[in-house]
Each structure stands twice: as C-alpha cells, then as structure tokens.
C-alpha cells in the first residue's frame, strides 16, 4: 500500500481551504473545528500525515426524520405489522425492520435471529392494542411519544412487552406523579403484574406512607385477606396509632362480612394488638359486633387486655416507622442563657438539620413524642433579663416544620421528666422557683387537656423518667435537700406510686431511658461530682447492675434510643458545657464518640421521631 502523499499548500478543492488554512504547522495537539452543523478534528498520524474526522451532529435525527417520511408515504418499507387485539378489527402498519429492531430488543430478535418473521413481509401481532402499537412505532422513528392518562397503562404494558425501556420509564414517572389514595393499590398491582419493579416499589411506599387515607378507598376493600395481612404486617406503615390498623381491618371485614368473618383472627394476629391501649381494647370488646360474634377473637383480645393491665413483660412490639427515617431531635438547652434551637441528628449519615426554633428559649425541658409529633414540656427561660419557669407545652410537626402551642401545664415545671403511656404525656416533678414538685399531671392530646394524677412519694427535680410495660418510672433527682438514688413506679390503672429498688449511685440530672426491657440511668450529679457511670435496672430481678461507663462525666444530659443503641448528648461536666455525643452498643458493652452538637449545651429536651419534610424546610429557608 502506498503511503498517503503529504499535503503541500492548499488542497485542490477550494471548499476545504478554510479548514486547511487554519491548521497549525508542525506535529502539535489535535485541533477541533466546529460549526452548528458539524465538527472536524485534525490529528497527526504516526507517519507524520494529518487526518481529520468529520461529524454531522444532527445526522441521526435528520436520517430518522427522512425514514419516518418514507414510512408515512409507504416507501422502502419491508414489513407490515398486522395488529389484532381482542374484538377490535385488525390494523396494519407499514415500517422498516431496521428501525423497529433499533428501538426494541423484541423486534431485533424477531427480525435477526433466524425466526420465521425474519423473511416475512406481513407479521401478525396479538395482545397489544393497535393504538398502542401505532404510538410505539412512532416513537421508534421520532423518539417522542405523547400519552394521555386514560391510556398510559396500555402504553406502558406494550412498552414492557417490547422492552422499550425509555417508554417504560417515562410512563412509570408519569404514574408516580399521579399516585393518590384512590389509585395507589391499583397502580401497585398493575406494576407487579407487568414486572415493573421500580413503579411497584414507589406505589407500595405511597400506600405505606398514606395508609390512613388509602384504607378508606374502594381499592382497599377489594384486597384479598392475604394482601391485607401482608400490608398491615409492615414495620414502615405510617399510622399515628395502632388503632388505625385495627379499624381498617374491621372495616374490611364489614365490607363483605359473610365471606370475610372467617379471616378476623388471622388479621388480628397481624395487628400489633399489644400496642393498643387497654381503654381501646375494652371499648372494642364491649361494642364491636364482629368481635362479639367470634369467641376465639374475643378471648385473644381479652388475654392481651389482661397482659397490658397487669403490666406483664411481653415481647417488644416492633415500632411502626415510615421509611422517611427517624432522627434524634434536640430542643432548647442552656449555654450562658437558655436556647431556642431545634436540631435533628441523623445517625445513619452523621448529619445535623437546623429546624424551626422554639417560640420561647427554654432549658430544663422534657421532650416526648406522640403520634409522630414532638412535644416540648415545661422548662425555664434563663435570660439576661431574668429567669422564668415555664408551664408551656408546645408541639412540633415534622411535616410542616412548625411549632404550635398547646394547653399549659397546671404549674410551671423546670427540670421535670416526661413519659408517654397509651398516647398520654406525663409531666413528672420539676420545680417552680423554690418549690420542688412531687405532683404529676397527664396530658390528653385529643382533648388538649391536662389532669393531675397521684403525686410521687418523693419530691423530685432533675428526675429521670422512663416507661416500660406501661409503667412510669421516676429515677433519682433532688428533693430540695438531698440528691437521690431512690426510684419509684406509677401504676396507671391504680393511680398509685410504689417504691422500687434504689440505684447503686445517687444521681440527679441523669439521663434515663429504656433499652431491651431494661431501664438505664447514665451520668448525673451526686452532690460532689458529675458522673460517667451507667447502671441498668432489670424489672424481672428488680436489681441495678453497672455497665460500661461513658467516656465523659456529664449531668443534665440528653438521652435517646435509636435502632437498638443509646445516645447521650451534651450536658455539663463540672467545668464545661459539652458538645460531645456518645453512643452505647449493648452487644459489646462499649461507648464511642460519634459526633458533636453544633455547640456545647446542657438541659436539652431530646426525643426520636420521623425525619422532617425537606420541602418545607427548603421553602422556609428560602429568602427569595
């Protein structure tokens, strides 16, 4: 082969003159020339000759446009698709095999793998509506499709049949945008039938997140008993309380009672009945006609009612937690003065979110969660202008990123404890000025009312509070004279307190929580030193046992349990307001530092609930 002659001077063709005249001399870097229609690249070859590559950028679009014109005018077509669907008259569409094969793996296999259709001029197609096939053929030529909501399911089904993934994704995205309580189950079932995993998952997630609304729709009542049992068994079902799930099951049975009454017992075992309140169970046992007609179901619920009211230890009921994630919230706190911060920590990625501030700065407050809502109870506003003990109860909604005021406590309570039984908040002890409370009051969110219950046997401020087996435990604190190691337990059915085994260590301002059916007391102040020791109470043996100590001494700390681990946040070590956050792993009996607060502080209110709505946060932070 003869080598290409080296160009000398300008090429003979004058149309290349602008290109060649701009080529720099010597063997340098590649030079790119581009226009709106094409681009050319000049590069040196190994033998010193220059070559160029030329690309017409819109050639493919133009070529397919011409092929579409040929299709519409029935020129150069090499196949006719004869499409028959149910009782609809067959329709014929002329096309080019190469174009169909380029857009659909099914057509490619049909026309290239030696199948009988490869040599056929007329190919019969069944199982797809002619209008759908017409649109898919148009898409093969134009890369564009327009689908109305009434026929999107048919188009998506056809795109799945012919493996046109881009159309499947477009239809899936459209259907996700159309999800609402009335159609989510139908879309989920359709996606499962055609094997569209992503759409099926998105529709199921919508059902879980909007269960309360979905359970009122016709599609819900058309579920089979197996489908319903599977649905209500989900941990990520988003409900305010388990009674929503119970009512949904009873309503489903009532929809066709003669046929469905046989499934009541199986459904009740999928409901987390131990998460129902005794009062609710008692009402249903007395008034629900479905239960009255089924002795086995009635006996089953009576047994659960007795276990709850007798406070028997039961297997831990898995918490319903939507997959939006659960974060550790810290409200208020103290550093030189009371703070109004509300922040949330995500242990899964170590990030912090700054959320809507408390309406009034507070420290020494309690944090509680009912129905996914975060409540800030009592506290004190320490400010340069003076100190004011608070009787306020404020409610934070993660979905709106907003606080709203609720009914006030009967008395101000600084450094009180808070716990939740049967959806009711208990505010325990605390102080108002020099008055140290033994009183306890209960808040009913549905009525927005506080009511006093039996007082503790001991006055306590800086008291740690925990709830286990529907019993309220008050641990340690300060009675106005002495720091305490005593602890007592409240029985709501009897409305009375009883002393339990005292702790091994005097602790005021300790962090108290429940993990794996044990009560943990971490840190605190014994009257001389801040503590880093931790002990736990076994309700079965009624004994306190030391576990591994924290890395830092701390009192007035925040504490929370998240995914089987204990987190302690901030506090005071006797010299410094801490910003450290430690995590306890019960499997290894070890503490580790995992993150830091955005600033040191003590006396924070801490609780765990769902992740806030990012859209609301972004909108409220927007200064546009």
UniProtKB/Swiss-Prot annotation:
Residues in BTB domain copies: 77-149
Single Gene Ontology MF annotation: transcription regulator inhibitor activity
PTM-bearing positions, type S-cGMP-cysteine: 434
Origin: domain of life: Eukaryota
InterPro entries, per database record: BACK, BTB-kelch_protein, BTB/POZ_dom, KEAP1_BACK, KEAP1_BTB_POZ_dom, Kelch-typ_b-propeller, Kelch_1, SKP1/BTB/POZ_sf
Predominant location category: cytoplasm
Sequence ranges assigned to domain BACK in this UniProt record: 184-286
GO CC entries: actin filament; adherens junction; Cul3-RING ubiquitin ligase complex; cytoplasm; endoplasmic reticulum; focal adhesion; inclusion body; midbody
Assigned keywords, A-Z: Cytoplasm, Kelch repeat, Nucleus, Repeat, S-nitrosylation, Thioether bond, Ubl conjugation, Ubl conjugation pathway
Pfam families per the UniProt record, alphabetical: BACK, BTB, Kelch_1, Kelch_KLHDC2_KLHL20_DRC7
Activity control: Ubiquitin ligase activity of the BCR(KEAP1) complex is inhibited by oxidative stress and electrophile metabolites such as sulforaphane. Electrophile metabolites react with reactive cysteine residues in KEAP1 and trigger non-enzymatic covalent modifications of these cysteine residues, leading to inactivate the ubiquitin ligase activity of the BCR(KEAP1) complex. Selective autophagy also inactivates the BCR(KEAP1) complex via interaction between KEAP1 and SQSTM1/p62, which sequesters the complex in inclusion bodies and promotes its degradation.
Start and stop residues of the Kelch repeats: 327-372, 373-423, 424-470, 471-517, 519-564, 565-611
UniProt record, GO biological process: cellular response to carbohydrate stimulus; cellular response to interleukin-4; cellular response to oxidative stress; in utero embryonic development; negative regulation of gene expression; negative regulation of response to oxidative stress; negative regulation of transcription by RNA polymerase II; proteasome-mediated ubiquitin-dependent protein catabolic process
Marked site: Sensor for electrophilic agents: 151, 257, 273, 288, 434
Protein function: Substrate-specific adapter of a BCR (BTB-CUL3-RBX1) E3 ubiquitin ligase complex that regulates the response to oxidative stress by targeting NFE2L2/NRF2 for ubiquitination. KEAP1 acts as a key sensor of oxidative and electrophilic stress: in normal conditions, the BCR(KEAP1) complex mediates ubiquitination and degradation of NFE2L2/NRF2, a transcription factor regulating expression of many cytoprotective genes.
Complexes and interactors: Component of the BCR(KEAP1) E3 ubiquitin ligase complex, at least composed of 2 molecules of CUL3, 2 molecules of KEAP1, and RBX1. Interacts with NFE2L2/NRF2; the interaction is direct. Forms a ternary complex with NFE2L2/NRF2 and PGAM5. Interacts with (phosphorylated) SQSTM1/p62; the interaction is direct and inactivates the BCR(KEAP1) complex by sequestering it in inclusion bodies, promoting its degradation. Interacts with NFE2L1. Interacts with BPTF and PTMA. Interacts with MAP1LC3B. Interacts indirectly with ENC1. Interacts with SESN1 and SESN2. Interacts with HSP90AA1 and HSP90AB1.
Name of the protein in question: Kelch-like ECH-associated protein 1
Taxonomy of the source species: Eukaryota, Metazoa, Chordata, Craniata, Vertebrata
Gene: Keap1
């Amino acid at each position: 082969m003869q080598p290409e002659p080296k160009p000398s001077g300008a090429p003979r063709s004058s149309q290349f003159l602008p290109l060649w005249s701009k080529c720099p001399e010597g063997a340098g870097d590649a030079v790119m020339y581009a226009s709106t229609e094409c681009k050319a690249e000049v590069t040196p070859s190994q033998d010193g000759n220059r070559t160029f590559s030329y690309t017409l950028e819109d050639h493919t679009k133009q070529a397919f446009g011409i092929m579409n014109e040929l299709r519409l005018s029935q020129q150069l077509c090499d196949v006719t698709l004869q499409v028959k669907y149910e009782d609809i008259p067959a329709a014929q569409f002329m096309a080019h095999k190469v174009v169909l094969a380029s857009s659909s793996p099914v057509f490619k296999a049909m026309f290239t793998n030696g199948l009988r259709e490869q040599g056929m001029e007329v190919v019969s197609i069944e199982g797809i509506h002619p209008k759908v096939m017409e649109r898919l053929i148009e898409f093969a030529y134009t890369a564009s499709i327009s689908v109305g909501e009434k026929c999107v399911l048919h188009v998506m089904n056809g795109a799945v049949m012919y493996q046109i993934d881009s159309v499947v994704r477009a239809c899936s995205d459209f259907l996700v945008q159309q999800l609402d309580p009335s159609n989510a189950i139908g879309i989920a079932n359709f996606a499962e039938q055609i094997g569209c995993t992503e759409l099926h998952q998105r529709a199921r997630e919508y059902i879980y997140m909007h269960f309360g609304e979905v359970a009122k729709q016709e599609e819900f009542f058309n579920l089979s008993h197996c489908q319903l049992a599977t649905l209500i068994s989900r941990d990520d079902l988003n409900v305010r309380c388990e009674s929503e799930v119970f009512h949904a099951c009873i309503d489903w049975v009532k929809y066709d009672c003669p046929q469905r009454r046989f499934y009541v017992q199986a459904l009740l075992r999928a409901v987390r009945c131990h998460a129902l309140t005794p009062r609710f169970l008692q009402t249903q046992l007395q008034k629900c006609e479905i239960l009255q007609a089924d002795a086995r179901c009635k006996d089953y619920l009576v047994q659960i009612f007795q276990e709850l009211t007798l406070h028997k230890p039961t297997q831990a009921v898995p918490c319903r937690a939507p997959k939006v994630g659960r974060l550790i919230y810290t409200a208020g706190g103290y550093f030189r003065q009371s703070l109004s911060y509300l922040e949330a920590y995500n242990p899964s990625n170590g990030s912090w979110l700054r959320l809507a501030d408390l309406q009034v700065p507070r420290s020494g407050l309690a944090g509680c969660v009912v129905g996914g809502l975060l409540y800030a109870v009592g506290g004190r506003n320490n400010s340069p202008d003076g100190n004011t003990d608070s009787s306020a109860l404020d409610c934070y909604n993660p979905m709106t990123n907003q606080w709203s005021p609720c009914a006030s406590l009967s008395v101000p309570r600084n450094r009180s404890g808070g716990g939740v039984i049967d959806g009711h908040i208990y505010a325990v002890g605390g102080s108002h000025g020099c008055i140290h409370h033994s009183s306890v009051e209960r808040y009913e969110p549905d009525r927005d009312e506080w009511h006093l219950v039996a007082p503790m046997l001991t006055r306590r401020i800086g008291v740690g509070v925990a709830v286990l087996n529907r019993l309220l435990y008050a641990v340690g604190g300060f009675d106005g004279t002495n720091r305490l190691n005593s602890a007592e337990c409240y029985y709501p059915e009897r409305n009375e307190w009883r002393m339990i085994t005292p702790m091994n260590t005097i602790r005021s301002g300790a962090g108290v929580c429940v993990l794996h059916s044990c009560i943990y007391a971490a840190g605190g102040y014994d009257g001389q030193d801040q503590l880093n020791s931790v002990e736990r109470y076994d309700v079965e043996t009624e004994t306190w046992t030391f576990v591994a100590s924290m890395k830092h001494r701390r009192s007035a700390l925040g504490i929370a349990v998240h995914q089987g681990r204990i987190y302690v946040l901030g506090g005071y070590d006797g010299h410094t307001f801490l910003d450290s956050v430690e995590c306890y792993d019960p499997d290894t009996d070890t503490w580790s530092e995992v993150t830091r607060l955005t600033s040191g502080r003590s006396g924070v209110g801490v609780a765990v609930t769902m992740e806030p709505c990012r859209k609301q946060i972004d909108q409220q932070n927007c200064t546009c």
